[in-house]
Regions:
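Surface-exposed beta-strand/loop patches in noncatalytic accessory domains
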Residues: 1-18
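Short coil turns that delineate tetratricopeptide repeat
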Residues: 164-165, 199, 233
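Terminal, low-structured helical/coil segments at or just beyond the last alpha-helical repeat
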Residues: 234-268
Length: 268
């Protein structure tokens, strides 16, 4: 099935599995012809198996396009600043873990789980976790704007907190929703976690103090206000301005703000 008519000394030849004579072949024979009838002669044949690793995994250019389709189904991809880099990394992770047939044979639940895990890994590898988390936060915020408070809470807990990605701003957002829904104990706990993660952001300290008032821990709240009332929350907003704004906001949401009168005496 294959013949080398030219005389050879040391030469490597590649016989591909695509050769018809190698299909379902139990044995492979090599024959040599020599016209040397006088001198002693030794023929050394070395057979080295060679496998095209990438080709053997079955991922053709067309097959990879199926992965591009999977990428379009990932809801967060549009929020990434480096989409192309993410896509390339995601495809590399998939084809590195699975042969094409293995990937196709996965159960739908197995495939969905693997895609989710490898997509997150691709986000991390391409250093785009901030974009990814901002998408999650925006999704929760959209629930909140539609007054779907429980959905917003559940989304933050499941998508961010449970995955150990939560930052101070995430616990602060939880605290805000807990306050509006009169879950004051949970609000206090969430704001406290925010202050632990970022104790330099006075906004979290103020929110924690507000939660203390709703929990009737007035004395502790007063101490926080006394400590920070001469500070600014940011470049333009003072602690006192923000504190009064918060009280008005709570009142607009129908919350009882009577206990805040005790706080206002400290601020005025």
């Amino acid at each position: 099935c294959w013949e080398q008519k030219e005389k050879v000394n040391k030469e490597a030849k590649l016989i591909s599995s695509s050769s018809l004579c190698l299909t379902n072949l139990p044995n492979l024979w090599f024959g040599f012809e020599s016209q040397n009838w006088v001198m002693n002669q030794k023929i050394v044949l070395e057979v080295v198996p060679w496998v095209d690793y990438k080709a053997s995994r079955g991922w053709t250019k067309q097959n990879k396009k199926e992965l591009e389709t999977e990428i379009t189904r990932l809801d967060f991809v549009s929020s990434l600043s480096k989409k192309e880099i993410f896509s390339g990394e995601f495809i590399d992770l998939i084809i590195g873990k699975y042969k094409y047939k293995e990937f196709k044979d996965l159960l739908p639940s197995e495939k969905a789980n693997s895609i989710q895990n490898l997509a997150i890994q691709a986000v991390q590898n391409t250093k785009q976790m901030n974009d990814f988390l901002e998408f999650k936060r925006k999704t929760a915020w959209d629930f909140y704007k539609k007054n779907q408070h429980q959905k917003a809470i559940d989304y933050i807990l499941k998508e961010i907190v449970d995955n150990k990605w939560a930052q101070a701003k995430d616990y602060s957002a939880l605290g805000d929703i807990y306050i509006e829904t009169k879950q004051f104990v949970k609000a206090k706990e969430s704001y406290f976690k925010a202050t632990q993660l970022d104790n330099n952001q006075l906004w979290y300290q103020l929110k924690y103090a507000n939660a203390l008032v709703f929990n009737e821990d007035i004395s502790e709240a007063k101490e926080i206000h006394k400590k920070y009332k001469s500070n600014n929350i940011d470049v333009k907003t003072s602690w006192i301005q923000q504190a009064k704004f918060d009280i008005d906001f709570y009142k607009s949401k129908g919350l009882n703000v009577d206990d805040f009168k005790k706080i206002l005496r400290i601020l005025d």
